[in-house]
Amino acid sequence: MLSHVIVEFEAQLWIWDARRDDSWNFVTLPAEASDDIRELTAGPRRGFGAVKVRVRLGTSTWATSIFPDSKTGCYVLPVKRPVRTAEGIEAGDTVTVKVEVL
């Protein structure tokens, strides 16, 4: 069993379909990383299946949660407006993200 998961990946920033404004932006974690995280966090889960993580995107770092996406079977990471503004990114951009499960 895994004891720790840190993953670095590139992904496209996208807007959640349920909210047409640009306030809900996400990146999708790769399938293999999502499987590793699911294995590491097996058992009782927090609300909505959330998993606490530490994130680095560009020069920005923060603690947040990732959430399982029933459509893809992967976890998704919300990227708040202050981070997008600080990094000069918007929906459609490809970003490099480092995620560490806490």
Regions found by a protein language model. Give the residues of each.
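A conserved hydrophobic position in a structured secondary element of the catalytic/binding core
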Residues: 29, 78-79
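Short, solvent-exposed hinge/capping segments at secondary-structure junctions
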Residues: 87-89
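Long, compositionally biased stretches
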Residues: 2-73, 91-93, 98
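Short, charged beta-turn/beta-strand-edge "cap" motif at the junction between a beta-strand
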Residues: 83, 100-102
